[in-house]
Swiss-Prot record:
Subcellular location per the Swiss-Prot or TrEMBL entry: Cell membrane
Species for this entry: Chlamydia muridarum (strain MoPn / Nigg)
Compositional bias of kind Basic and acidic residues: 323-342
Membrane association type: Multi-pass membrane protein
Region described as Disordered: spans on this chain: 177-220, 249-283, 296-367
Protein name listed in UniProt: Uncharacterized protein TC_0273
Low complexity bias spans: 302-312
Length: 367
């Protein structure tokens, strides 16, 4: 069983409504009251410090209560700076005021503590007075704040001003250049597209330029037509052979000897000295017309009448090319056979015994 969970309703925390909560949340409801609260904290801390010094007259353990008063004053200063730093201009003003006034405030408090210690009692007792010790510590903090806060802020402020000037110049230049660049880019794109469109139009208008999409189907159709025409021619040649020679077994037996009948090389050399390896003749005088036609059909050469009836001009060219390639292949084979025969005959002549020199002399004598 699937358990259906009920939707969980968010629980709201109970709002505390009281005088203290309203007093603390007043700056959130009224932003201008923030400055009043910050200044009041600073004033309270100053009043506490002055009242402690006057009440103790520079002696006693009550002087250590100045430390929380100083902390409250520092908190008021930081809150005032953060409230003033809402806009960039107010932030710059608040940062400069805090950086410059902090060392002076610390030196003033240190001087007040030291003078109060001196007023209570002089001599070596001053070094044991807690007011004097606290004054010396605050003086050290003032020097540290002068180096770490004021000097660094002033040095960084010059860099920030330079960076802001550079950014303003870049933004102004970019805003001025934006319309020009947009116009130039639009012109360039329009020119490019217009040139491409013109090229496409010229290509389409040309009669001899086929489209790229129609090239592949045309080539496929041509190859299919050529294959069909070759199949038709081959079947017709076989039918014609059967009509002319019903006894095809005798023809098949005589086929191996057709090489020697068709192409017989001339072993004798011409008197001019040129090699006769490339000279061949086809003695068909002893063959009948039926045999020659059969041999022509076997070699792949079809008659013009049958090809003209059943084949297209492209198929005719295809058949003529195939017959030429077959002739070239046979010619090459006959050349190789003739060379092998010559090599065998030369080997036989080398292996035969040489005639005696007497017989040679006898033969060379004139009768």
């Amino acid at each position: 069983m699937v358990k259906i969970m009920a939707p969980i309703t968010p629980t709201t925390s109970p709002q505390v409504k009281g005088l203290l909560s309203r007093f603390l949340t007043a700056p959130d409801r009224h932003p201008k009251l923030r400055y009043v609260y910050d200044i009041s904290l600073i004033a309270i801390s100053i009043l506490c410090i002055v009242s402690i010094i006057l009440w103790t007259q520079g002696s006693g353990l009550a002087l250590f209560a100045i430390a929380p008063a100083l902390a409250i004053g520092a908190l008021g200063v930081t809150l005032l700076v953060s409230d003033l730093a809402e806009s960039p201009k107010s932030k710059e003003v608040a940062d400069t005021v805090a950086a410059v006034s902090l060392p002076f405030i610390l030196t003033g408090t240190a001087a007040g503590l030291m003078f109060s210690a001196i007023a209570v009692g002089g001599g070596a007792v001053i070094l044991a007075n807690p007011l004097f010790l606290m004054g010396s510590m605050t003086l050290g903090f003032a020097l540290m704040s002068l180096h770490k806060v004021t000097y660094q802020y002033l040095s960084n402020r010059s860099q920030w001003q330079k960076q802001n000037k550079i950014k303003q110049i870049e933004s102004a230049a970019w805003e001025n250049k934006l319309p020009k660049e947009s116009k130039e880019s639009s012109l360039q794109t329009s020119v490019r597209y217009s040139s491409l469109a013109r090229k496409d139009k010229t290509r389409r208008n040309k009669p001899g330029m086929p489209n790229k999409g129609s090239q592949v189907p045309a080539s496929i159709a041509n190859t299919e037509r050529s294959l069909r025409s070759e199949e038709v021619l081959h079947s017709q040649s076989l039918l014609r052979q059967k009509e002319l020679f019903p006894n095809t077994s005798n023809i098949k037996k005589e086929l191996p000897n057709t090489k020697s009948i068709l192409h017989t090389p001339l072993n004798r050399r011409s008197p001019s000295g040129s090699d006769s390896d490339d000279v061949y003749y086809t003695p068909r005088a002893g063959l009948s017309s039926a045999e020659t036609s059969a041999l022509g059909d076997i070699s792949g050469i079809s008659s013009s009448s049958t090809s003209s009836k059943t084949s297209t001009p492209k198929a005719k060219r295809r058949v003529v090319r195939s017959s030429r390639s077959e002739r070239n292949a046979r010619h090459h084979r006959n050349k190789e056979d003739h060379r092998q025969n010559q090599e065998e005959s030369s080997d036989d002549e080398d292996s035969s015994p040489l005639p005696s020199p007497r017989r040679k002399k006898y033969r060379s004598r004139p009768k």
